[in-house]
């Protein structure tokens, strides 16, 4: 089975602490593109987690021109909708870090684009099954 080609938009904090190590351990992905406003962060992520021919960008729109299966959106919360929508419109599936968006309207736009394009939009709500989250849900 072919590995999925992943692009990473946002290469600090949560990317290095959680997502990139997990993607690397998974074994079903190859990370072939990295983007961050600070090129050195993207370059460091590439050297640690990328394929030998992985490319580095400072503009996510350039990364979206790559032949990718999925884009991980690990950017500041205020940019989640913009980047996710652009990724789906360019033919990529999206894994977006939480929160999904700033407003209901942005979140709805993301879902609408996912339906229109047929792309998977996954939001990283990984805490919903923790004991404290389940307790609050039942309260």
Model-based region annotation:
Residues 29, 54, 92, 117-120:
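Short, well-ordered coil/turn segments that N-cap beta-strands
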Residues 1-50:
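N-terminal Rossmann-like dinucleotide-binding module
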Residues 44-53, 109, 113-117:
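Short, conserved SAM-binding/catalytic segment
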Residues 54-109, 113:
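Beta-loop-alpha module in the N-terminal Rossmann-like domain of NAD(P)-dependent dehydrogenases
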Residues 14, 40-41, 78-81, 102-105, ...:
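Short alpha-helical
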Residues 101-139:
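A contiguous active-site-proximal alpha/beta segment in oxidoreductase catalytic domains
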Residues 15, 58, 96, 121-123:
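Hydrophobic residues in well-ordered beta-strands that form the structural core
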């Amino acid at each position: 089975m072919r590995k999925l080609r992943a692009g990473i938009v946002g290469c600090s904090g949560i990317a290095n602490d959680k997502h990139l190590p997990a993607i690397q351990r998974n074994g079903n992905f190859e990370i072939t593109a990295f983007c961050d406003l600070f090129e050195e962060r993207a370059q460091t992520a590439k050297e640690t987690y990328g394929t030998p021919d992985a490319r580095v960008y400072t503009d996510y729109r350039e990364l979206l021109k790559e032949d990718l299966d999925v884009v991980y959106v690990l950017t500041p919360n205020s940019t989640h909708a913009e980047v996710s929508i652009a990724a789906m419109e360019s033919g990529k599936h999206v894994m977006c870090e939480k929160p999904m968006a700033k407003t209901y309207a942005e979140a709805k736009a993301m879902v609408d684009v996912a339906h229109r394009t047929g792309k998977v939009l996954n939001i990283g709500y990984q805490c919903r099954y923790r004991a404290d989250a389940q307790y609050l849900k039942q309260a």
